[in-house]
């Protein structure tokens, strides 16, 4: 590869302040000048290319505009001593494909690299970046954004539908475009009663089976479904249907395909310098060097890019444990302690605090959610109070315990009663989201309905029981696509969900109907979401009835005027004349019953009011006597 003796670039349109803040790690809009941008210099229109490669000897831009030839005029020039390179190419234009040819200064070895800041890329297996300057879109979601800025999600409903775009639905066996999805997805989510959709990663990734969690193009919209404008149109349509959009975001590690970020200038650049810290053996990826200023700029600017350019309402941050712990998924001897001898990743902790601090300061109403499975404290505590600053944390403990419980034969559930009650011991330590995500319905774990115990009737009943219990449990909610109609096969990323079963089988149609009614019930009852993180909002009636495997508890609204009594029967036994303590004297009415005939249940519902009597029970001065249907959740409400 030819070496070019570079000279200081005097024609760069990049401001000195931008350069300063970029190298200081404080620039949060680096995408505005890094990568490929339309420019007019000396009266000539073209594209200015800028990248960061501190150990490069030379960088040449090749592409459609120069027939992919290395030419002297297309070599970048260094604009700082810290590795910022730039060049203006007059005849480059929107839609041209390009790559960087990066030569290392010590070895003279060169590699062909995609642009880390490219806004669009070729569909796999091709790997070139694509100049994308026509990204303007006229949004129509002003009312949504105004509402978002004023919303406190802690005391509002939040019921999330997690979605993998490529396999939700296909068209003639092919990926649906963002525009095609705009015609069906918003309406479906609205009709089903979900408040938010959570997209699994939408940035470019080479391997379909990675589901987007091993990205190469952090700024590149997933080209499988169309272009930038198409995605903006989809988000706009969702917002106009009062549906929030959360994006899975992967700031901890990246794909090690050679065209990507790995050894970008021939040396560790975006990854840690220490090989042991850089290598992520578990996932076959490289870990970001979260202590390096330019890497922090790359990532925090990326978060800002998705939020500002695509009006994303929240980021679910993937694999937070991998960011927090130096010894995450590593044996002794495979990790390097921090300067104090501990296993905490000090750079990762600082990065997460800075990320959340920036977003809180600049993006009103945008939420961040931690996918984190350890007992690290104060994840959802504000940064100024010593926490990491996330708004929410997935409750992985609740998920693991309750899925284990619901898979047990009811005969043995009484010996494992703590699995279904333990979550309330620690619930108020974080702002939890109860999540049944994609990770729980793949790799031999079975689909959600297939995790349920028993024959077909009991599986459907168990699913209704479990989901009703989940709706009653404090915390926001998340469910993965396909669970809402009881798909029996595990999720497969290479094919669409089995929607045909809804038309073919009454049981699946009834299950879909159940989820819609349950979601509507959740949304309409303030007691179910107004005090999720306030002790006032939840009270046990009886948490200790392990012998009958029955749970009972109260959910209350802020003003205490709305109270719901949940009774969950985790056995296939009908209980007659069951005495239950209640907080208030008066008349109680059934407002939800998962055993309803319209859901596919046995139809053991209470059509008449139930009057309390002045008899002590479960620590209350009043009690009611009820019939509890089998494998069902019963919800009562005081009406007078």
From Swiss-Prot:
GO biological process assignments: glycogen biosynthetic process
GO cellular component term of the entry, any: cytosol
EC class: transferase
UniProt entry keywords in alphabetical sequence: Carbohydrate metabolism, Glycogen biosynthesis, Glycogen metabolism, Glycosyltransferase, Transferase
One Pfam family hit: Alpha-amylase
Alphabetized CDD domains for the sequence: AmyAc_Glg_BE (cd11322), E_set_GBE_prok_N (cd02855)
Keyword Transferase: yes
Catalytic residue positions: 318 (nucleophile), 371 (proton donor)
InterPro entries attached to this UniProt entry: A-amylase/branching_C (IPR006048), Branching_enzy (IPR037439), GlgB (IPR006407), GlgB_N_E_set_prok (IPR044143), Glyco_hydro_13_cat_dom (IPR006047), Glyco_hydro_13_N (IPR004193), Glyco_hydro_b (IPR013780), Glycoside_hydrolase_SF (IPR017853)
Enzyme Commission (EC) number: 2.4.1.18
Protein's pathway: Glycan biosynthesis; glycogen biosynthesis
Entry annotated with the keyword Transport: no
Signal peptide annotation: none
Catalytic activity: Transfers a segment of a (1->4)-alpha-D-glucan chain to a primary hydroxy group in a similar glucan chain
GO molecular function, one term: 1,4-alpha-glucan branching enzyme activity
Task performed by this protein: Catalyzes the formation of the alpha-1,6-glucosidic linkages in glycogen by scission of a 1,4-alpha-linked oligosaccharide from growing alpha-1,4-glucan chains and the subsequent attachment of the oligosaccharide to the alpha-1,6 position.
HAMAP family: GlgB
Family membership noted in the UniProt record: Belongs to the glycosyl hydrolase 13 family. GlgB subfamily.
Record's subunit section: Monomer.
Full protein name: 1,4-alpha-glucan branching enzyme GlgB
Organism field: Francisella tularensis subsp. novicida (strain U112)
């Amino acid at each position: 590869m030819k070496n070019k003796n570079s000279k200081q670039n005097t024609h760069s349109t990049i401001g000195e302040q931008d350069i300063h803040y970029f190298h200081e790690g404080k620039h949060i809009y680096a995408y505005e000048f890094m990568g490929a941008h339309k420019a007019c210099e000396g009266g000539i229109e073209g594209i200015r290319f800028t990248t960061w490669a501190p150990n490069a000897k030379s960088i040449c831009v090749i592409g459609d505009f120069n027939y992919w030839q290395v030419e002297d005029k297309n070599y970048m020039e260094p604009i700082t001593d810290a590795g910022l390179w730039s060049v203006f190419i007059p005849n480059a234009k929107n839609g041209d494909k390009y790559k960087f040819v990066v030569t290392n200064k010590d070895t003279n070895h060169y590699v062909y690299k995609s642009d880390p800041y490219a806004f669009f890329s070729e569909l796999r297996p091709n790997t070139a970046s694509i100049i994308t300057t026509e990204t303007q879109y006229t949004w129509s979601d002003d009312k949504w954004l105004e509402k978002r800025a004023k919303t406190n999600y802690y005391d509002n409903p939040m019921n999330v539908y997690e979605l993998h775009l490529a396999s939700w639905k296909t068209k003639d066996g092919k990926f649906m475009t963002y525009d095609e999805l705009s015609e069906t997805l918003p309406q479906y989510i609205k009709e089903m009663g979900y408040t938010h959709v959570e997209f699994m990663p939408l940035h470019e990734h080479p391997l379909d089976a990675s589901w987007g969690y091993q990205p190469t193009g952090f700024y590149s919209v997933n080209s499988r479904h169309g272009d930038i404008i198409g995605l903006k149109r989809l988000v706009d349509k969702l917002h106009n249907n009062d549906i929030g959009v959360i994006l899975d975001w992967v700031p901890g590690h990246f794909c090690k395909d050679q065209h990507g970020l790995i050894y970008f200038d021939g040396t560790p650049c975006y990854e840690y310098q220490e090989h042991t810290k850089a290598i992520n053996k578990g996932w076959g990826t490289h870990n970001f060097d979260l202590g390096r200023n330019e890497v922090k700029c790359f990532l925090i600017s990326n978060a800002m890019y998705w939020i500002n350019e695509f009006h994303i309402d929240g980021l679910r941050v993937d694999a937070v444990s991998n960011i927090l712990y130096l010894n995450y998924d590593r044996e002794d001897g495979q990790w390097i302690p921090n300067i104090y001898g501990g296993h905490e990743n000090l750079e990762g902790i600082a990065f997460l605090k800075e990320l959340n601090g920036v977003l809180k300061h600049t993006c009103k109403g945008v939420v961040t959610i931690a996918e984190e499975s350890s007992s690290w404290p104060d994840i959802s505590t504000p940064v100024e109070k010593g926490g990491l600053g996330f708004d929410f944390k997935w409750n992985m403990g609740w998920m693991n315990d309750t899925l284990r419980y619901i898979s047990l034969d009811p005969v043995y559930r009484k010996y494992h009663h703590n699995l279904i009650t333990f979550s309330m011991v620690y619930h108020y330590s974080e702002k939890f989201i109860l999540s049944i995500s994609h990770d729980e319905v793949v790799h031999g774990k079975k689909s959600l309905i297939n995790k349920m115990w028993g024959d077909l009737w009991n599986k459907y009943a168990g699913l209704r029981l479990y989901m009703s219990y989940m709706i009653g449990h404090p915390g926001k909610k998340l469910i993965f696509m396909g669970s809402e109609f009881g798909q029996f096969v595990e999720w497969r990323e290479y094919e669409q969900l089995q929607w045909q079963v809804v038309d073919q089988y009454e049981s699946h149609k009834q299950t879909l109907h159940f989820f819609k009614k349950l979601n509507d019930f959740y949304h309409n009852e303030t007691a179910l979401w107004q005090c999720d993180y306030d002790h006032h909002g939840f009270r046990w009636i009886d948490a200790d009835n392990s012998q009958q495997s029955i749970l009972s508890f109260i959910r209350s609204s802020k003003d205490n005027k709305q109270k719901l009594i949940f009774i969950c029967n985790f056995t296939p036994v009908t209980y007659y004349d069951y005495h239950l303590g209640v907080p208030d004297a008066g008349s109680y009415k059934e407002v939800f019953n998962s055993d309803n005939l319209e859901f596919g249940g046995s139809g053991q519902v209470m059509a008449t009011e139930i009057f309390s009597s002045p008899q002590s029970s479960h620590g209350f001065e009043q009690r009611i006597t009820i019939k509890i249907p089998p494998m069902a959740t019963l919800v009562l409400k005081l009406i007078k």
